[in-house]
């Protein structure tokens, strides 16, 4: 009986991962800007800050355009650890051009790690959710938005909520279930 229960849990977990991965791919396809500059970064970062205040959570928020940090805000209640998590998650997204949450789920499904698969040090790279590539239609990845301070799925959702608003995509069409 224990084996059957474990097998059912594994199947359910795999289905959840596959469902999330499909939705994450949709997010990366749909959440694209026509243009993105420092003013857009300010609007995005400010919206994430407002959403986090509405939710009563403290976040570190970082937005990069190319290799330049164009927005950073560490809310009261966060600390250096949150900024370091943001750096590590952002490094993974800058290298692999997919969200840190998608990377996490893909590696979990494979039973692997970024260190084992890519040889990347855990000190500098993390695959916990909360970092999302910023895409411009017809151009590709131009930057990264990263959120750190709450559980990884919630970090990711916070970034996606703000991206959907600024890209004019209804949140219900791209949000994780």
Segments predicted by a language model, with ranges:
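N-proximal short alpha-helices
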Residues: 13-25, 112, 128, 132, ...
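Secondary-structure boundary elements
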Residues: 54-55, 137-138, 165-170
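Short, solvent-exposed cationic patches
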Residues: 94-97, 156-177
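Intrinsically disordered, low-complexity terminal regulatory regions
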Residues: 2-79
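Structured interaction and signal-relay segments at domain junctions
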Residues: 55-118
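Extended hydrophobic
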Residues: 115-164
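Short, positively charged
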Residues: 39-42, 108-116, 168-172
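Generic macromolecular interface patches on structured domains
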Residues: 58, 149, 169-173
């Amino acid at each position: 009986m224990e084996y059957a229960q474990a097998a059912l849990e594994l199947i359910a977990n795999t289905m959840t991962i596959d469902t999330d991965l499909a939705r994450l791919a949709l997010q990366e396809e749909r959440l694209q800007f026509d243009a993105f500059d420092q003013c857009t970064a300010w609007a995005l970062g400010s919206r994430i800050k407002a959403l986090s205040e509405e939710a009563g959570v403290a976040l570190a928020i970082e937005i990069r355009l190319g290799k330049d940090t164009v927005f950073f805000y560490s809310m009261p209640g966060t600390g250096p650890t949150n900024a370091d998590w943001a750096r590590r998650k952002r490094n993974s997204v800058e290298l692999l051009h997919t969200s840190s949450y998608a990377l996490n789920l893909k590696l979990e499904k494979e039973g692997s790690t970024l260190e084992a698969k890519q040889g990347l040090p855990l000190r500098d790279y993390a695959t916990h959710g909360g970092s999302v590539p910023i895409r411009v239609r017809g151009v590709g990845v131009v930057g990264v938005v990263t959120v750190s301070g709450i559980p990884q799925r919630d970090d990711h959702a916070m970034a996606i909520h703000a991206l959907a608003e600024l890209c004019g995509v209804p949140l219900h069409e791209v949000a994780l279930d």
